[in-house]
């Protein structure tokens, strides 16, 4: 499970590999909050994310992370707050992310950092390993709850 650039992925928390990043309740209107959800044999479209390169390359590449079900962008709305999928311009910096390797114990995992540095990294709240945990944009510490697997779909 590694990030290979643009493509469609199930994004999985390192500290809870039985869960995935999920646009909660599969809503088609803007603003769905993002939480963890139990992985199944075949992920639903609200648990799949299209990663699209929008600027830069290599370590400075910026990506939009687009929910396959709704078409809305993963967005950090404010620091230490749950991320969501609002209707927002693709040029808005809060909808842009960098993805960096953070290999841990020989596992190929990554951090997902918001372009707005004050908005930090994609983070599972309180290191939760339970379905329904909020996914935040929190201060970047590259902790285990801020590392992710990318499972190509």
Swiss-Prot record:
One of its GO terms (molecular function) is carbohydrate binding. InterPro entries: Ricin_B-like_lectins, Ricin_B_lectin. Beta-D-galactosyl-(1->3)-N-acetyl-D-galactosamine binds at residues 22-25, 46. Coiled coil: none annotated. Keywords: Lectin. Gene3D superfamilies: 2.80.10.50. Residues 58-153 form the Ricin B-type lectin domain. Homodimer. Lectin that primarily recognizes glycans with a non-reducing terminal N-acetylgalactosamine (GalNAc), with a preference for the alpha- over the beta-anomer. Can also bind non-reducing terminal galactose (Gal) residues but with a lower affinity. Strongly interacts with glycolipid type glycans with terminal non-reducing Gal or GalNAc but fails to bind sialylated or fucosylated forms of the same glycans. Strongly interacts with galactosylated N-glycans, displaying highest affinity for alpha-1-3 branched mono-antennary N-glycans but also binding to multi-antennary glycans. This is Agglutinin.
